[in-house]
Design a protein with these regions (language model features):
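An acidic, low-aromatic, low-complexity terminal/linker signal
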Residues: 1-150
Length: 150
């Protein structure tokens, strides 16, 4: 480890066989997947709405947003992601751990990961490659998918 490394805490997530991470400051909380209120005419990626502390939070499938197959075994976890005053829920297969990573050594994402810009880059954690998500881009992508409510 380099003595001058700028280490950042990341919340390590698993979706199917893939590992993703969010900066810990962008992940408000992780909780068991509650019952969600469905929305009519919602896109397939929008699983429903959650009311938490008086705020309506749209909840999306990480499989659809990240274009990665999930396990879908009924043990999914809801991660509340924040960008400024906006919050969205992302349903993932598993929250693994909190890891430390030097984001200054982050590698560019593979072309197949570029999509909507939700992947900032890739870091190594042990023997795993971890795609680091851009919380702002995740929120932007999922909010853009919300149906227009009259």
């Amino acid at each position: 480890m380099i003595a001058n490394a700028m280490l950042t805490e990341l919340l390590l997530l698993r979706q199917g066989a893939e590992f993703f991470a969010l900066e810990l400051t962008a992940a408000i909380e992780a909780l068991e997947l509650p019952v969600l209120a469905p929305l009519p005419d919602a896109p397939a990626s929008l699983l429903g709405m959650l009311t938490d502390r008086g705020a309506a939070i749209p909840v999306f499938s990480a499989s659809r947003v990240l274009e990665v197959e999930g396990r879908g075994n009924g043990d999914e976890v809801l991660v509340i992601v924040r960008d400024g005053d906006r919050q969205v829920g992302l349903v993932v297969d598993e929250v693994e751990d909190v890891i430390m990573a030097d984001l200054t050594t982050m590698q560019r994402p593979l072309d197949s990961m570029r999509g909507d810009g939700v992947v900032r880059g890739v870091v190594h954690s042990g023997n795993r490659l971890v795609a680091v998500l851009d919380a702002r881009a995740v929120v932007r992508v999922v909010v853009r998918a919300l149906p227009k409510l009259a």
